[in-house]
Amino acid sequence: MDFEKDLRAVETNIPGLIVFDLPVHGDNRGWFKENWQRAKQTALGLPDFGPVQNNISFNAKKGVTRGIHAEPWDKYISIAAGSVFGAWVDLRPGDSFGQVYTTVLDPSVYGQINVYGVTTKSERH
């Protein structure tokens, strides 16, 4: 696991989709990470938002497919253990329509993804 790195925001090819690379602090007891730190993350471009809902899911077996639904609010995604292959497609009309972003998320590499200001297909009707 990559310990003691700096917090950084990574822009993607989809406007409004930001990956936060989180510092993970470790020692002989295990590891600790700040999953959310408002002042630090808003300074790096995360809009100041109020979460609407907080969910946790657990997959008992490898290879489970889950989808993130297209609710019309910001999403802040965090991985607690293991890894996840994530894929995002921009369905908004405009220059970025059809752009795809994929990455493997885990607690130590790209631990957070913020999807903000992304209009869902259902909102266009």
What do the PLM-derived regions correspond to, one by one?
Residues 103-125:
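Conserved metal-binding segment of the jelly-roll/cupin
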Residues 1-110:
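Non-catalytic, conserved peripheral segments adjacent to functional cores
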